[in-house]
Amino acid sequence: MEPCRIRSVVFLASVLALAASAGLAEEAISVTVDATRIRQKLQHIELVVPVKPGPLTLYYPKWIPGEHGPDGPIANLTGLKFEADSKTIPWQRDLLDVFTFHLEIPHGVSHLNATYDYIEPDGVSATDKLLALEWNEVVLYPADIPAEKLTYEAKLLLPDGWKFGTALPVENESGNRVSFKPISLDLLVDSPVIAGEFYRTIDLTPPGEPIHHEIDIAADSADALNMSPENQKEMINLVAESGKLFGARHYRDYHFLLALSDHVAHFGLEHHESNNSRLPERTLLLPSSGMSLGGLLAHEFVHSWNGKFRRPADLTVPYYEQPMKTDLLWGYEGLTDYIGPMLAARSGLWTPDQYHEYLASIAAMLGPGRPGRTWRPLLDTAVGEPGLGFARGGWLNWRRGTDYYDEGDLLWLEVATIIHRESGGKKSIDDFCQEFHGGPNHGPEVKTYTFDELVKTLNAFAPFDWAGFFHTRLASTSAEAPVGGIESGGWKILFNDKPLKLEGRRGNPGDVYSVGLQVGSDGVVTDAIVGSPAFEAGVSSQMKIIGVNGRVYTQELLSDAIKSAKDASQPISLLVVVDGYFRTCTINYHGGARYPHLVRDSDRPDYLDELIKPHAAAQ
């Protein structure tokens, strides 16, 4: 063995690899996405990569910013072939990482051509009438070059007659072909495209605002595009309120990208200059439209400042194959989940009563609805996100999931009340946001932070043991919900038999807080609260209720049975199916319907409503 010689060889190989990488970074990679067959849930991709002879490693994006886990949809990458000079280049998937591909580039080859298809077997992002394109799903990239150093020239082919919206600067359009200006890979991945047969753009720029804002809507029908004048005004207010809150913007212009369909996954994903959000087709036509828009679009919009511009250092990585550390998600997502609803209320998308009901619902869900808090603290829901956040099969109340959103909301509401109290009313959460998220607009950029830097900024506004406060809240295994912010804001939680005035998952029926069940319209139990009357009677997640007190199950019959049990001595009888067997579960509950609400505490001033009053002039 010759250790000195071996070290020299290794060093030389490293230098050559870096030199090759530098060469690859100098010339743009071309990616063309042919979405003309998207109605068949298929996109065809052609990639041209400048290369040098020798080993080449290509990656498919694995750790996607905003998704907080290694969930790049690699299983949807199909038909992969490589060619150079009309000759096939063999490839080998890495033995340990399915996102990694190895090739050997022959001498004399300067460009590698890759062709492959991206399929949508579940229709998560595409329907017969629309497409929500995330570029990380359709690109490959060479190893050892940071995403910000790689340049891509992207092109998109759409079905005839389709229109599109994106924050990407356009080079030119010709027929159904769109060419975008050269852009770094990190900004390409950060700039989704929405397109569709039924499409509409609405200007959301407030009067006097120098930066353009718009919402680009693609829907499964023409009628679904009809946003009311009231919602338009409220969305304009949202933009105005964000400027007032943060005192700065960190984008060239901003696009709310909204897909309206019953056939895509419903969620939102944040980006610097846009957000990719999906809601049911008729969302804009319903009386609850403001609640839906305020619940999703406001959250994703706030991420432009909190999560994209200011980002935890451990969530900021140069390569998409590099793991992220997620322990500060209570800041990334939790603070966003607090500010989003606050701005929804300030803008008029939500009424004060809706904001109150929203807070009551998450407080109740984290109290009697989350016995898992007795063993798994808030911090662990953040740390465990990459592997545990979106576990399926029920039992959410016991194992917990993405509670750094809801519990983070209550955490930051308490922070807001502490700032107000400790500063003698001279400072507010708005002042913190302007300091922490402010600064000059250089367009999309990232300014990282650590826990210590977050604490230091808070101390500058309101000297307090912030580190101790956060450590206590993050490590708590109390069964009680963290409602300090609600109570310090002059309100308290009250349970009564009046239903929540909320839609969707927030408007859960009273069986959650009474017998302890979450049940779908088909009778399938999505969750049975551990320790609740229903759980003690033998009901568990994934069972199916087919009968209530001798009658065929409906949600209404179950609700009626819960109400009637208050004045009856007989228990509630449920006939369930589990693993092909019938079982009768007898629930000994006589408390009646229970729904959470906020009520004023007359012994304390109402600071909560001060926080959600409009702050911008444009209302």
What are these regions (language model features)?
Residues E26-I64:
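Early extracytoplasmic/domain-onset interaction patches
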Residues V9-A20:
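Bacterial N-terminal signal peptides
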Residues T36, V48-P50, P65, P70-R252, ...:
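Non-catalytic architectural context of zinc metalloproteases
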Residues M1-I6:
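N-terminal secretory signal peptides that target proteins for export/translocation
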Residues N275-L284, F309-R310, E321-T374:
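Post-HExxH zinc-binding segment in Zn-dependent metallohydrolases
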Residues G340-P341, W350-Q619:
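C-terminal recognition in membrane/secretory proteostasis and scaffolding
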Residues D203-L329:
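Juxtacatalytic substrate-recognition/specificity segment
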Residues S21-A25:
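Sec/Tat signal peptide C-region and signal peptidase I cleavage site
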